[in-house]
A protein has these predicted regions:
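Conserved alpha/beta-domain cores
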Residues: 1-204, 212
């Protein structure tokens, strides 16, 4: 990927994001996270030069490699994949900006225990399976608020900052929209408990996600 292509692609995405957010409100701010799991470190550097600053990885070892390769750049790294318990210590040592995929109370308790042992804190989002899909991770919508509150109470070394969900994996836009609206409703309930981020939408559906309140 050369800089010209990266700039063109990024500009197209920013234009779409701007259009979607302004249809809600000029005060609705949206942060773009570039998912770099299929990109090389060189690609990430090119995107950085084009203006992108935040990137997401779904494997701990890939995150480690790219963080080491691009150590000189002021990048913001998010972990967005399924976190296996045997990788928790490795992820803690990398100190990502945000773990977007905290998908159960059980995982939160294990993460908190290991954070306490290292005297560290990490920010995270609770992942919600709003599409009720067996292939997706996350807590079910009907227990999400309660699980969020339990993590706040039981896991002082995890700084919860909101929720994340992946839209329904179907062609029907109405069904995808419903899954996003379900997550947004939960997010709204959690704002009084400190939730700041409602992370929804991928390359195929981010405009719809923003229309439903993703930020």
């Amino acid at each position: 990927m050369n800089k010209q292509t990266a700039t063109k692609n990024l500009d197209e995405i920013i234009t779409k994001v701007e259009g979607a957010r302004l249809r809600i409100s000029e005060h609705h701010i949206v942060k773009i996270i570039g998912i770099s799991k299929y990109s090389t470190s060189t690609d990430v550097k090119t995107l950085y030069e084009a203006g992108q600053r935040a990137f997401g990885e779904n494997k701990v070892q890939d995150l480690k490699q790219k963080m080491e390769d691009l150590d000189e750049l002021p990048l913001e790294w998010h972990f967005v994949g399924t976190l296996q318990k045997n990788k928790i210590n490795n992820l803690i040592d990398l100190n990502p900006t945000l773990i977007q995929s905290l998908d159960s109370l059980d995982l939160a308790l294990e993460l908190n225990k290991k954070l306490e042992a290292k005297n560290k804190k990490l920010s995270a989002l609770l992942q919600i399976n709003s599409a009720y899909e067996e292939t997706k991770s996350g807590v079910l919508p009907e227990v999400a608020v309660e699980v969020y509150k339990q993590i706040l109470e039981l896991c002082p070394n995890i700084v919860l900052k909101g929720v994340m969900s992946i839209g329904a994996h179907v062609e029907d836009e109405k069904i995808i929209k419903e899954s996003f609206k379900t997550t947004k409703k939960i997010y709204d309930e959690l704002v009084p408990f400190g939730a700041k981020y409602c992370s929804m939408g991928m390359s195929s559906d981010f405009e719809l996600a923003i229309a439903c309140g993703s930020n």
